Swiss-Prot record:
One of its GO terms (molecular function) is structural constituent of ribosome. One of its GO terms (cellular component) is cytosolic large ribosomal subunit. NCBIfam families: PRK06049.1, uL30_arch. Pfam families: Ribosomal_L30. The keyword Ribosomal protein applies. Disulfide bonds: none annotated. Belongs to the universal ribosomal protein uL30 family. One of its GO terms (biological process) is maturation of LSU-rRNA from tricistronic rRNA transcript (SSU-rRNA, 5.8S rRNA, LSU-rRNA). Part of the 50S ribosomal subunit. The keyword Ribosomal protein applies. This is Large ribosomal subunit protein uL30. It comes from the Archaea. Keywords: Ribonucleoprotein, Ribosomal protein.
Amino acid sequence: MVELLGIIRIRGWAKAPWYINETLEMLRLRYNFNTMMYPKTSQILGMLNKVSPYVTWGEIDPDTLKLLIIKRLETAKGDKVSDSYVKEVLKIENIDTMVKQLYEGKIYLHKLDQYFKLPIRLHPPKGGFKGSVKRPYKNKGEFGYRGNKINELMRRMM
């Protein structure tokens, strides 16, 4: 079972060094409130540590991932993702099976950009951020690693 990291960009590109913008581009996080899912590997964690003042991340649970796919993921044509689209294009029975295969590491969301519009675009969080985006999550801020609390933030941003 692969651990999936949900990564959300929370700060813009202005006054950011070029290497930060380049790393965010590699993670496909071009704009504020874009999100992507990646497996937890040492390479991804190294990139996240480099850009931590601009993103927040944590382990996403299957329920939140399913909600994210249903509500915010778009097909390449701009329509909402449905069971019939997943069955037609990916040859997977339904969205539940797709989520299961994402967690088993059989398919990767970041490699399916020919079928879906990636990255996934989110709204700003309902009720606003609880802390400052200029401080780390551990010090009553918002950026950096937040573990399972990423699920709560993603649900507020859908």
